[in-house]
Amino acid sequence: MKKIELKNNSLLKDIVTLLNLIIVGYSAILVFLTILSVISYTVLSDRLGIKLNVQFLPSVDFSNWWSVLAFVINLLTASLTIYLIYLARNFIKNLIGGKIFDSSNTQLADKAWKVFLPLTFLSVKVAASGNPITLPFSFNASLSFTPLLGALIIWLMMKILEKGIDIAEENEFTI
């Protein structure tokens, strides 16, 4: 069986480069859309003499607090997604550096599963139709369990890494 060298693995280095581009690009798009959304629904658009129609779902109407809350939840979800990509990039960089059973990997995994938990609850989609006073009225809420499953898998990986670190330390002291 051929041993795979992680330090000189060009595929892993290309993945890190791609993740860097995704992080920078996604962050720039997020900042740009946030600025445009704020400008398009405030007095600034009237002062600048331009009318912008930015479709950053949901559209922000700063006079309606539900709209602002949905906007903040979208920003938070996008920011947490960027942070998860950043953590994955750091994990791959540790693999390239030869740090497999290292405490920094368990710290990254600990941060990652804790980021997945709020993403589970931020993925709730709520839809209401009708008027709650007059019937018919329907209220539907759906929750995606995919981030929760991701949190569980990463937590299990973290526990395996912790056990691997303990075994590696025992082997160092035995020799």
Task: Please place each PLM-identified region on the residue numbering.
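Cytoplasmic juxtamembrane regions at transmembrane-helix boundaries
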Residues: 7-12, 86-111
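Alpha-helical transmembrane segments of multi-pass integral membrane proteins
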Residues: 119-175
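Hydrophobic alpha-helical transmembrane segments of multi-pass integral membrane proteins
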Residues: 24-31, 77-84, 113-124, 153
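Perimembrane loop-to-helix junctions flanking transmembrane segments
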Residues: 42-64
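Membrane-helix interface/capping segments
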Residues: 2, 49, 66, 78-100
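Hydrophobic alpha-helical transmembrane segments of integral membrane proteins
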Residues: 98-132
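Cytosolic juxtamembrane helix and N-cap/initiation of the first transmembrane helix
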Residues: 1-39
